[in-house]
């Protein structure tokens, strides 16, 4: 009798995606982040669902409903801390996943890469509307500042902002619709993840060498299920340590004060995972220019496949490109640091320099390094 998991219409899909999937034999721990992101999404949807059972999306009661969750709901404090820090884990895994894609040339799977970039943007949008929901000071002013950026769009800007606000300022209508968006977006993300996997399984996984792995494949289960389980265990450990011991380490103290439209916080800044983009936004003294640079900082990922000049796929055997990759990584750390600093000397000089370096490395230096490395491969005798 044939095995049920290979014949049953539903189980066959699961089997082909997670059990009998042929995987390259040499993929490293950098390939763990896809499954970790899937787990993060499940954790966020589940904790978010339980939070939504007790949360009220009204300006008068939103802040106190979050306090009520933490004080009066059974394990509400834990659910809230897991959800807030789960977002940080989500973005940590996302950045490492994208970094892996750039380092090993996975972006040459163009469909998978493009849907991945759209996923990144959607997750960022979800995190932004979610941050507004507790209705603290930084929630309110973050929403005001970021939505206001749309007013830089010529002609329709102001109308667009007021349409998104549902009035003439960030108020009750804004909070209600942001809650609706925050609830629906994770399910849209889940659908997009399935499409992401669908495209990936059309080609099969890339591997560290960047060579075609078809000659040496192993089944996903048990080899990579156990490997992913180790990664999962480590991520859950870090998440629990964060949620149990230092739940507010990555948050902003201003968000412990209820939203007050009459009192602006001294430093308006987003959560750590948006700081690099915020630094790029602030480094341009023109409003529209800043908004375009902010968009470009993420959308530049879409043109990376077009800028691939090397004969080799991976950076594994390309020392010049490797150096540039780690320079780019350091540059992103600098941008993250600058995004969290006040607008004063010397930070206002470092910001534009780091922003220029970011675009210069991706758009010019990396493609140039690929050409130089191609030339170095040619026999000279």
From Swiss-Prot:
Amino-acid positions noted as binding a ubiquinone in the UniProt annotation, renumbered to this chain: 201
Residue numbers binding heme b b562: 83, 182
Cofactors demanded by this protein: heme b
Keywords: Electron transport, Heme, Iron, Membrane, Metal-binding, Mitochondrion, Mitochondrion inner membrane, Respiratory chain, Transmembrane, Transmembrane helix, Transport, Ubiquinone
GO BP annotations, alphabetical order: mitochondrial electron transport, ubiquinol to cytochrome c
Top-level taxon in the UniProt lineage: Eukaryota
Functional description taken from the UniProt entry: Component of the ubiquinol-cytochrome c reductase complex (complex III or cytochrome b-c1 complex) that is part of the mitochondrial respiratory chain. The b-c1 complex mediates electron transfer from ubiquinol to cytochrome c. Contributes to the generation of a proton gradient across the mitochondrial membrane that is then used for ATP synthesis.
Protein name in the entry: Cytochrome b
Lineage: Eukaryota, Metazoa, Chordata, Craniata, Vertebrata
Gene: MT-CYB
């Amino acid at each position: 009798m044939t095995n049920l998991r290979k014949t049953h219409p539903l189980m066959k899909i699961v089997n082909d995606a997670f059990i009998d999937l042929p995987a390259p034999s040499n993929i490293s721990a950098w390939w763990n982040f896809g499954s970790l992101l899937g787990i993060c999404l499940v954790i966020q949807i589940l904790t978010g669902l339980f939070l939504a059972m007790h949360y009220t999306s009204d300006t008068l009661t939103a802040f106190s409903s979050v306090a009520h969750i933490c004080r009066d709901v059974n394990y509400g404090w834990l659910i809230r801390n897991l959800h807030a820090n789960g977002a940080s884990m989500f973005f940590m895994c996302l950045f490492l996943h994208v970094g892996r894609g750039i380092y090993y040339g996975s972006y040459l799977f163009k469909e998978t890469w493009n849907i991945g970039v759209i996923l990144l943007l959607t997750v960022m949008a979800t995190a932004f509307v979610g941050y507004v929901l507790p209705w603290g000071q930084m929630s309110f002013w973050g929403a005001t500042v970021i939505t206001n950026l749309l007013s830089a769009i010529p002609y329709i800007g102001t109308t667009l902002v007021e349409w998104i606000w549902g009035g003439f300022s960030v108020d009750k209508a804004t909070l209600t619709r942001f809650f609706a968006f925050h609830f629906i977006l994770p399910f849209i993300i889940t659908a997009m993840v399935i499409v992401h996997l669908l495209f990936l399984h059309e080609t099969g996984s890339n591997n560290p060498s960047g060579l075609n792995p078809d000659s040496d494949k192993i089944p996903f289960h048990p080899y990579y299920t156990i490997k992913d389980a180790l990664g999962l265990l480590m991520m859950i450990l870090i998440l629990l340590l964060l949620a149990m011991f230092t739940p507010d380490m990555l948050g902003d103290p201003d968000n412990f004060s209820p939203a007050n439209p009459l009192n602006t916080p001294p430093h308006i800044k987003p959560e750590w995972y948006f700081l690099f983009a915020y630094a790029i936004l602030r480094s341009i003294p023109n409003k529209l220019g800043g908004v375009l640079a902010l968009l470009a900082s993420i959308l530049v990922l879409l043109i990376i496949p077009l800028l691939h000049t090397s004969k080799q796929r991976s950076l594994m055997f390309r020392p010049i490109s490797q150096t540039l990759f780690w320079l780019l990584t350091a540059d992103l750390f600098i941008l993250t640091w600058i995004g969290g600093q006040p607008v004063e000397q010397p930070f206002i000089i470092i910001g534009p320099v780091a922003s220029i370096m970011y675009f210069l490395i991706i758009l010019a230096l990396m493609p140039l390094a690929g050409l130089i490395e191609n030339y170095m491969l040619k026999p000279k005798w």
